[in-house]
Amino acid sequence: MLHEFTFKSYNKIDDIQAWIYVPACEPKGIIQIIHGFGEHSRRYLYMITDLMDEGYIVTADDHVGHGKTAIINDRWGDWGDEGFHTMMEDEHALMQIVKEKYPNLPYMLFGHSMGSFIARDFMAKYGNELTAVTLCGTSGVWPDLEESINKLKQLVAEGKGKESDPA
């Protein structure tokens, strides 16, 4: 079963587009997907289907400035002044909506890329409300970072690539 709905963003401007996917069997838990930069949550439909087949309720939304949220608000790429904090609070609002509808189930977050950073902030503030968190495509140590930066600067200075920005 699919529930599609909107809720008011923390920024009090946007309406956030959200979905709850419910399996046909008795659910064993809830997984909230937090997508990355420039993405939308429907990019994860194959994963959502697999998780539902395993008995999980899955929920997701499109962040401010992203996907269907951007379409319905006509605000592409506009996160506002507190965009990152807004996205984290919107994820918490979604969690509250889902927990009210489906109480007493284990609640997990899956954050990909930028979504993993949102999930980290979420854990810092609301971690006691979670059972587990998966961080995917997140940052880590880059041992040759300085060398890579210098190589990229050189390529930009030479005007290599389709786009270069000397600033």
Q: What do the PLM-derived regions correspond to, one by one?
A:
Residues G111-D121:
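Glycine-rich nucleophile elbow surrounding the catalytic serine of serine-hydrolase chemistry
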Residues M1-C25:
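N-terminal cap/lid segment of alpha/beta-hydrolase-fold proteins
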Residues G36-E39:
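Active-site glycine-rich loops that stabilize anionic/oxyanionic intermediates
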Residues A119-A167:
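Alpha/beta-hydrolase-fold enzymes
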Residues I34, D61-H63, C136:
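Alpha/beta-hydrolase
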Residues Y102-S113:
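Alpha/beta-hydrolase fold nucleophile elbow
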Residues W79-K99:
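Alpha/beta-hydrolase active-site loop
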Residues S41-R43, D50-D74:
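Conserved alpha/beta-hydrolase
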